[in-house]
């Protein structure tokens, strides 16, 4: 499939959730297993903010070791509201043009975007601009259209259930409602 070296960018956007690093690792392992030395992975730092400002780094297989159970995201993330993507603010930066420039400067062939609704709206916008984009659904809200369950959701439910169970026990011990 890859007859010449391809460069794949990965970014995480929005809030962090359980499973981000595991997903990043899984994607990297799958790419290396399938394409070996014919793939290069580029980490976009701090979500779309990094794509706007040109913050990215070349990654190697060692970068993905030891992150399976690590919380957060090794790439960093920032909330960059979708509604502001087309707005040229006082800094006079055309964000869409800046993201396209970084994509081209990094010589990306494809960009994988891990995030929720806003992340996927921006990914769709970039796709409409002619960039090759793949969206990976990530949200503890489990509210992305077309998905049954998003990663991060089950862990959030498990933690919330545990907190409620513990408070229930405490409330019973003190004969009160919490």
What are these regions (language model features)?
Residues 36, 126-150, 157:
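Short, acidic/small-residue loops that bind anionic groups at enzyme active sites
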Residues 1-13, 23-107, 118:
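A cross-family phosphate/adenosyl-ligand binding-site feature
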Residues 149-169:
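Short, glycine-/small-residue-rich phosphate/pyrophosphate-handling segment
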């Amino acid at each position: 499939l890859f007859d010449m070296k391809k460069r794949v960018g990965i970014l995480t956007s929005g809030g962090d959730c359980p499973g981000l690093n595991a997903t990043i690792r899984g994607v990297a392992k799958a790419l290396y297993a399938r394409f070996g030395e014919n793939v290069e992975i580029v980490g976009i730092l701090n979500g779309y903010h990094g794509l706007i400002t040109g913050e990215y780094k070349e990654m190697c297989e060692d970068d993905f070791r030891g992150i399976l159970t690590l919380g957060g995201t090794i790439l960093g993330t920032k909330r960059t509201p979708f509604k502001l993507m087309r707005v040229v603010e006082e800094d006079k930066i055309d964000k869409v043009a800046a993201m396209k420039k970084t994509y081209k400067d990094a010589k990306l062939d494809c960009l994988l975007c891990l995030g929720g609704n806003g992340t996927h709206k921006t990914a769709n916008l970039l796709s409409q601009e002619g960039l090759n984009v793949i969206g990976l659904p990530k949200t503890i809200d489990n509210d992305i259209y077309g998905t049954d369950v998003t990663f991060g959701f089950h862990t959030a439910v498990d933690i919330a259930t545990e907190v409620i169970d513990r408070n229930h026990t405490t409330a019973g011990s003190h004969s009160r409602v919490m």
